[in-house]
Amino acid sequence: MALRLNGSSSGYVELDVPAAAGSHTLTLPDGGGSSGQYLQTDGSGGLSWASVTTGKILNVWQGVFTGIQSFAPGPSAPGPRADITNLSVTLTPTSASSRFLITCSISMGGASNSPAYYLMRDSTDILLNTSSLGATTLATWGSHHSGNTGYIYSTDLQTISYVDSPATTSSITYKVQGQNAFGAGVAVFVNTSQANGRAAPDPNYYNVRGCSTITVMEISS
């Protein structure tokens, strides 16, 4: 039998149950709940008010590098890796279930070289390409500039985003390392072009010096 609730002037709301064997009791909670809440069941007929849980941004950190840095090539193989100045943040997670959205933007320049970048948590690479082919450099991201002379005046903005789940409440550091993956080439520059970053820099207006950043957002699970 359906239960019909008539409106004060017109219309009604009718509650009905399917034709099924057995009896079921639903117990309503005390009170009217709060704005935006919904009724949930405990699986045994008990109803209660609950709030929708979604991820929220708990904290935001940022590292900014406005200077100039270079990475030398190796004699016949990739040069050494090194931290990019100021592109690091040290934090303590609010919860072990927190996730972290890391966004890195690097302004780089050079010609006849291959800049490679590595996203790290403490001393561990947390995102690397795995499709090795011969002597391929496996990095988080990077690019290659040909020997075209025009590239010595250019800068590119390289950007990547990644969500990390460190599962800890201990202090951690997110950072970016750089490397010149081209052997016997010329230097890779952060925040300037090759023409503007070399020992005898070209001071003309067409050489743009930029900025690089790392931003980390802690998101509740």
Where in the sequence are the language-model features?
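Short amphipathic
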Residues: I57-I68
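Terminal beta-strand-rich extracellular "head" domains
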Residues: V64, F71-R81, T90-S171, K175-S221
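Short, solvent-exposed loop/turn segments enriched in Ser/Thr/Gly
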Residues: D83-T85
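Extracellular repetitive beta-rich solenoid segments
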Residues: M1-I57, A96
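Well-ordered beta-strand positions in beta-sheet-rich domains
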Residues: Y12-E14, T25, S88, T159, ...
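Generic recognition of flexible, low-complexity loop/linker segments
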Residues: V13, G36, S88-T90, P203
